[in-house]
């Protein structure tokens, strides 16, 4: 028998070719030059810019209240044009556009009346809210637009700024995007224990919906530079900012929760007073809840290993057992003092469970949690919290090795 091809092959091939010819491809695609790519947003208390005042005088106005000012950081496609080889661009890579009104959605669309490239949020990285605005309105109100608008990524990071939020999106350096810089700095947890784990929009919304108190990384600015310094305390019942933790208090929170990937603890030599630095290589935190006489209590056991990162003492016995034990004890004393200070602040001053210890009660004592959850922050404020800390020096850098 000869090899006969099935009769259905030829018609099928014709159909497939016809479908390929009719395929529209990326019918909804838009050229990148036609997009106003927003990489960051800052939201402040409403204050009209000089440009807006001038436009309104010419009749460019509509019905609104000046409740908030929204600033978008938009990529400028020609921002580096005209630069020589190895030289930075003659223009900034970005442009900050500010508009004032009472609806974030309306303000976003308002920009399309003055720019050929409307706002496009698929590459959005950060949202920064000023402390004044966060004290006035709840985060649920301020973030509602970003969660509903499909163009904005739920993974974009949320920050609070002490002072004007728009200033965090400005830099002296014209070769860098300020919004990108904020995400880069917030990724430096492996180098510094005074940073919070990044807070994406979706996680913040989860805490807000659960009426949980939580922390947001705080930003400060000066002379065209920005620094991540401490944390903003968001109160669960209201969703508003009620205060701040300083850098060392934030570090203490990370010790308790175990959210430390790296960092240092500086102490002083017992006899000489010289600087000794313990570099953190690992931290483990175990939190256990218990109920005694109808009251909740927590036992927190923290273990850390590290290396001797720096020592200024001229003594020759730095690696003897008794001196290593002293280094460990001095470093532990510093951490314990910071934890005690932080606990007093969050329990007695703010009465806000930013440590999220309520999760342990919910898991291990579900019946009690049902009873307590509405007033949990107040119950947390009166809870007994015991911390047990152990630090061990395991490495000594390249200057010496431990002798057995």
Residue ranges and their predicted role:
Residues 2-404:
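Membrane-proximal alpha-helical signals and transmembrane carboxylates
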């Amino acid at each position: 028998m000869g090899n006969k091809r099935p009769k259905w092959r030829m018609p099928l091939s014709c159909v497939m070719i016809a479908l390929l010819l009719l395929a529209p491809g990326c019918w909804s695609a838009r050229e990148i030059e036609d997009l106003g790519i927003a990489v960051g947003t800052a939201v402040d208390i409403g204050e009209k810019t000089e440009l807006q005042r001038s436009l309104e005088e010419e009749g460019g106005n509509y019905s609104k209240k000046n409740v908030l000012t929204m600033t978008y950081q938009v990529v400028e496609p020609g921002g580096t044009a005209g630069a020589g080889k190895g030289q930075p661009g003659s223009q900034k890579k970005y442009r900050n556009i500010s508009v004032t009104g009472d609806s974030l959605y309306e303000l976003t669309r308002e920009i399309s009346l003055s720019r050929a490239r409307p706002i496009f949020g698929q590459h959005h990285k950060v949202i920064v809210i000023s402390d004044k605005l966060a004290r006035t309105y709840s985060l649920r109100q301020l973030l509602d637009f970003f969660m509903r608008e499909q163009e904005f990524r739920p993974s974009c990071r949320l920050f609070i700024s002490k002072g004007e939020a728009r200033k965090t999106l400005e830099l002296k350096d014209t070769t860098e995007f300020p919004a990108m810089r904020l995400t880069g700095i917030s990724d430096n947890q492996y180098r510094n224990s005074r940073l919070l784990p990044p807070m994406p929009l979706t996680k913040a919304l989860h805490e807000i919906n659960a009426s949980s108190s939580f922390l947001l990384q705080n930003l400060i600015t000066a002379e065209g530079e920005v620094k991540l310094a401490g944390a903003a305390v968001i109160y669960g019942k209201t969703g508003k900012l009620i205060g701040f933790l300083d850098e060392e208090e934030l570090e203490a929170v990370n010790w308790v929760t175990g959210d430390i990937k790296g960092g240092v603890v500086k102490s002083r030599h017992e006899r000489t007073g010289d600087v000794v630095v313990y570099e953190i290589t690992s931290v483990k935190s175990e939190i256990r809840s218990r109920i005694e006489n109808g009251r909740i209590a927590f036992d927190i056991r923290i273990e850390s290993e590290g290396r001797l990162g720096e020592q200024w003492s001229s003594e020759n016995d730095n690696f003897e057992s008794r001196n290593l034990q002293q280094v460990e004890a001095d470093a532990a004393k510093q951490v314990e003092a910071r934890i005690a200070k932080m606990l007093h602040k969050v329990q007695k001053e703010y009465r806000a469970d930013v440590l999220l210890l309520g999760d342990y009660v919910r898991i291990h004592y579900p019946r009690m949690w049902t009873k307590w959850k509405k007033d949990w922050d107040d119950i947390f404020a009166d809870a007994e919290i015991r911390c047990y800390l152990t630090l061990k020096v395991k490495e000594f850098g390249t200057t010496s090795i431990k002798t057995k």
